[in-house]
């Protein structure tokens, strides 16, 4: 069942919510095998890797799947086929400056 949590700050501001909506929660509960919590540092690392290696500028929220994979939080094998949906448009200049300090 959905649980209300304390409001958090994150570079992935599009994903921050105190409580999921009932329809969204029901869909996710039915169609997923698990969840992963991804730190801002991992989101920024994924963003930088996508920018430098893939030439893709993405918003932090869309880097969450890749951030979890880079951290080893997804049960993936080298032979698995994986798809992450990457989008842009919600990138603040401050976030781009933060990428300068991120180590790959």
Regions found by a protein language model. Name each.
Residues 1-104:
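PLP-dependent amino-acid enzyme catalytic core
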